[in-house]
From Swiss-Prot:
It comes from Xylella fastidiosa (strain 9a5c). Residues 1-345 are annotated as: A. The gene is htpG. Belongs to the heat shock protein 90 family. PROSITE patterns: HSP90. This is Chaperone protein HtpG.
Length: 637
């Protein structure tokens, strides 16, 4: 492997340069994670070889027993990780070790603050794989040959992490990849047998193939110690796939480390569910709920889905057919005994086996979230902060689990003045007033914008709780979530508000009588506002404000209009209903006004104020200001 040909120097991709600088100057408290990352890469390489060898057994050459070997040299201050997995060609080494193809990289780099300790945590969230070698090494050599290529087509990749790397063609008889770390002066303590063994046990005990180190002999006689002896390798891990072991034999720490292995996320998961199904279908699943959202959660082409194994043989990453899109944040493994080893993504698109597994895994994931919400409410708050908007896609996508998904949703409400989205629908129902049979809600841009909205006035007066829906997809969500626990949802800004049994018969009769006495005023206002409004009527929503704009029953609300505008779609024109409070002093003054110009100015001012109170923008702000200034001048005269 010493003869090199066709040596070239390449520059790292810009994002890699930035990551390398962070690695080189890293303030990681647990620098030993470099070993976990490199072992994880080696295990992935073995999985890929197993899969490709299903259709091309010759790729195994004469070395079918896959393993990872870890060596160290105290004198040379090196650590070597050697695998006999799939290996890399020259082009693959340049592509895989010189660039980052992971979506969301640019977003990730933008979040870096320059504070090295904070950035170290962010790097851990992102997962840097191979580049973590530079946490402890100032020079890294990689020797590799892809399975199926000749011995003369090996590649040597070398870098000091200083902006460029060298590649050369070498002879490499053995298939696979050998990574040699030349340790920094202050990191040479890692080149110790006990340190490496304990680190491997801590982070990589779950890896499903042997991780071997040279057996360390403890001799009692000097002559035995001096006698030359061929190295004897021994496995330092359990070397069995974690999900195949009985649940009772697996420690929490092992579950956590396995999650980090499959997700490349350095934070512990919030929850996990390990389940073996036997009977008509046979499969094992191990599902995890992450603590943090990945940077590419909202990227349409981002990697998602479970790792798929068939009878313990790795088939593919990101098998997205086993969970609906709204559960795309779930990480994990599914190992089936009912799918064939030559299964493809196309075959997975449909079929009774996949459909049945998808339904069961979806239910298991939702059960896991339900248990998290019940047993660890603070952890569920963390989950909701990171993944709540994604879960809100569920009622539209998964009709069969609509009620279950709805029970997991959280909203702000008038019950909790903190504005935190902490109210479950079941909690709301438990607090409903006697005679209340509807779930009332209001949508808006933010909690601050709607917490004192005029739409809430009658509900505050009667002590009725209202859900405050302030995520940008909430109005869209409510198009699919019509009821919960047999009770209908009502948008309090929409249509002619009917409080049902919450209003007494006397109240309803009084409202009808007042509306009749104000019919003439309603007609005058409608004639003045003209095409700006669909209707003018007396309001039953208001106690303190003079007027409010109600949304027509079939019309789009502000959130939906903004969503459509943002996506470049045509927004249908809608006209609000102008409702006025007959007992408000301004309305009484308006009713008594005989000067038509002043009546028109005041009517338009009230209309524009109602639009602003609803969170909308004014079509003609200049005219609003002109009218308001004119009125103020008259009042101050």
């Amino acid at each position: 492997m010493t003869l090199e040909a066709d040596k070239q120097t390449h520059g790292f991709q810009t994002e890699v340069k930035q990551l390398l600088q962070l690695m080189i100057h890293s303030l990681y408290s647990n620098k030993e994670i470099f070993l976990r990352e490199l072992i994880s890469n080696a295990a992935d390489a073995a999985d890929k070889l197993r899969f490709e060898a299903l259709s091309a057994p010759a790729l195994l050459e004469e070395d079918p027993n896959l393993r990872i070997r870890v060596e160290f040299d105290k004198q040379a201050h090196t650590i070597t990780i050697d695998d006999n997995g799939i290996g890399m060609s020259r082009d693959e080494a340049i592509a895989h070790l010189g660039t980052i193809a992971k979506s969301g990289t640019a977003d990730f780099l933008k979040t870096l603050s320059g504070d090295q300790r904070k950035d170290a945590n962010l790097i851990g969230q992102f997962g840097v794989g191979f580049y973590s070698a530079f946490i402890v090494a100032d020079h890294v050599d990689v020797y590799s040959r892809r399975a199926g290529l000749t011995a003369a087509e090996g590649v040597h990749w070398s870098s000091k992490g200083e902006g460029n790397f060298e590649v050369a063609t070498i002879d490499k008889p053995q298939r696979g990849t050998r990574v040699v770390l030349h340790l920094k002066e202050n990191e040479q303590h890692f080149a110790e047998g006990w340190t490496l063994r304990s680190t491997l046990k801590k982070y990589s005990d779950h890896i499903g193939l042997p991780i071997e180190m040279v057996k360390e002999e403890h001799h009692g006689k000097e002559e035995e110690k001096d006698a030359p002896k061929e190295a004897e390798w021994e496995a330092v891990n359990k070397a069995s796939a974690l999900w195949t072991r009985p649940k009772n034999d697996i420690k929490d720490e092992e579950y956590q480390e396995f999650y980090k292995h499959i997700s490349h996320d350095m934070t512990n998961p919030l929850a996990w569910s390990h389940n073996k199904v036997e009977g008509k279908l046979e499969y094992t699943s191990l599902l995890y709920v992450p603590t943090r959202a990945p940077f590419d959660l909202y990227h349409r082409n981002a990697a998602k889905g479970l790792k798929l194994y068939v009878q313990r043989v790795f088939i593919m990453d990101q098998a997205e057919q086993f969970l609906p899109l709204y559960l795309r944040f779930i990480k994990g493994v599914v190992d089936s005994a009912d799918l064939s080893l030559n299964v493809s993504r196309e075959i997975l698109q449909s079929g009774p086996v996949v459909d049945s597994m998808k339904a069961a895994l979806s239910k298991r994931a939702l059960d896991m979230l339900e248990k998290l919400a019940k047993d660890a409410p603070e952890d569920y708050k963390t989950f909701w902060k990171n993944f709540g908007q994604v879960l809100k896609e569920g009622p539209a996508e998964d009709y069969s689990n609509r009620e279950k998904v709805a029970s997991l949703l959280r909203f702000a409400s008038t019950y909790d003045t903190s504005g935190d989205p902490s109210v479950a629908l079941a909690d709301y129902i438990a607090r409903m007033k006697e005679g209340q049979d509807k779930l009332y809600y209001l949508t808006g841009e933010s909690y601050a914008q709607i917490k004192d909205s005029p739409y809430l006035e009658v509900f505050r007066k009667k002590g009725i709780e209202v859900l405050l829906l302030v995520d940008r997809i909430d109005e869209w969500l409510m198009n699919y979530l019509h009821e919960f626990d047999g009770k209908s949802f009502v948008d309090i800004a929409r249509g002619d508000l009917d409080l049902g049994n919450l209003d007494s018969e006397a109240d309803k009769k009084a409202q009808e009588e007042i509306a009749k006495t104000k019919e003439a005023l309603a007609s005058r206002i409608k004639a003045t506002l003209g095409e700006d409004v669909a209707e003018v009527r007396v309001s039953h929503r208001l106690t303190d404000s003079p007027a409010v704009l109600a949304i027509g029953e079939g019309d789009l609300g502000l959130q939906m209009r903004q969503l459509l505008e943002a996506s470049g779609q045509k927004v249908p024109e809608t006209k609000p209903v102008f409702e006025f409070n007959p007992s408000h002093p301004l309305i009484e003054k308006l009713d008594a006004e005989q000067d038509m110009d002043r009546f028109a100015d005041l009517s338009h001012i009230l209309f524009d104020q109602a639009a602003l109170a609803a969170g909308d923008s004014l079509k003609d702000p200049a005219n609003y200001v002109r009218r308001l200034n004119k009125l103020l001048l008259e009042l101050s005269a």
